[in-house]
Amino acid sequence: MAANNLSYTIAPLEHTPLDEIAAKVDLVRKTFRSGRTKDMEFRMKQIRKLYWAIVDNTELMQDALIKDLRKCKYEAVLAEIDWCKQECIDMVNNMEKWLRDEPVPNVPLQFRAMKHRTRFEPLGVVLNIGSFNFPFQLNLPVVIGAIACGNCVVLKASESSPNCAMVLKKIFDESLDPECFTYVNGALPETQLLLEQKFDKICFTGGKAVGKIIAQKAAETLTPVLLELGGLNPAFVTKHANLKLAARRLLWQKSLNAGQVCMSHNYILVERSVLSQFLGELNNQMRTFFPQGAKNSPDLCRIVNAGHFNRLKKMLDGTNGKIVLGGSMDESTLFMEPTAVLVDDINDSMMTQEAFGPIFAMMAVDSLDQAIDIANTVDPTPLSLSAFGSKAENNKILDNVTSGGATCNDAFFHSQIPQSPLGGVGQSGMGNYHGIYSIRTFSHQRTIAEVPYWADFLFRVRYMPYQWPVMNRMKAVADSKPNFDRNGNKTKGITYFLALVLGLGSKKSKGALLRWAVLVVAAAILEAKKGVLSQLLTR
């Protein structure tokens, strides 16, 4: 039933009683073992019902986001609600295709009768411990992917966005089978007790410190984890960048959700020759974004709570740099203006701590090589990076700086569609999800072979007593020959030259087909011209 009239009042966060948590997990475990969630139509129906629960509770979701983050309705729809709806639709429309058995590629001829393939099978019970900054967009897609793969789910939303946690509970209650998909609300005690239960996958979005604790706890039972953590994400601006667009897009990255985005930049490395111009563009864009000032803007979120506000303020208080953009704040309303600090030391507080807010460092560099060295020193495995430069410069950054994801000439657009994978690398996390990538994350690819009884003669070689003549006959038929020499160089035998001739000089099948098509068309044209010429000569 629709809740868009807001007649429903969001209750204060209700902590799940500790003595109910184990029973909740046991119930969904029992349901999984019954096989109920393995039915494809059941999974699709659950996701469809979830979609309509999101639609029906849209205004309630907006209200919760306003209360928790002062996130405006526009941004709630843009960055949260529509994203979740699209994830539902994309999954329902494609999951049957994505979940089909996949044949094992490159199977030798003598083994093809065995029908080797991989089958996507559900893992079991998935625990998702969510984050506060995008309470719907970072929670529901994990649930959608896990449901699509046939798992049962336990959701633990963040207590730092309590109104959103209660709306998520309502959405679960209204749309999903409670014996398959359940929730736990609470804080540290509830989370600790959850981690004492046995799960088949644990997903966590948040900071490194908690991520390490969860990984250690999961290791006790060899439970796989999906960790989407943060990082000291760099942005690069070279003298060949479009400075106006770079400023506009990077400022947006620190204004969206008040910069409380795990993929937003922590610092910008700017080529010294364009630093002054780039700073001017940043300040121009600030005035464009917030014509009445950032504090008076109805579009700018607030910091989630006093603890995070004070953490950000401490970073600014501890810097030896100079504020060159913004700088205003109001603790009573948790307002903090997008703020840039020009620093000259990679050990500055603005460079060593993850901001996860609207503040960021800027540092001048003399070359792209210097910028790359700094980025690899500050954090060799960030979650994200943004590169603004020429195509060659951007490629050089991609080749020399590792990150979970990267966007050239814009801000974290690599993760702005629900079809692309989101995930970290190294210290910024492990695993990824969204769309088809959720299928691999929340499934076990089980290898299957079906060996027909009649094929036994093909594999006489394996049976005792072993006989060398049988081995030699098999090797004569099936033994692979290397196409490389002892120095590791590729050899060019008759097969290579035959393929080159048949491919008309192209090493790839597409190129060969295109060349043959051109050849056939050219031959047809020549033949037609020849016919016309013959007719003219016979007149």
Curated annotation (Swiss-Prot):
Catalytic activity: 4'-apo-beta-carotenal + NAD(+) + H2O = neurosporaxanthin + NADH + 2 H(+)
Keyword Oxidoreductase (UniProt): yes
Assigned GO CC terms: cytoplasm
Known EC number: 1.2.1.82
Induction context: Expression is increased about three-fold after 30 minutes of illumination, and decreased thereafter.
Family: Belongs to the aldehyde dehydrogenase family.
Name under which the protein is recorded: Beta-apo-4'-carotenal oxygenase
Protein source organism: Gibberella fujikuroi (strain CBS 195.34 / IMI 58289 / NRRL A-6831) (Bakanae and foot rot disease fungus)
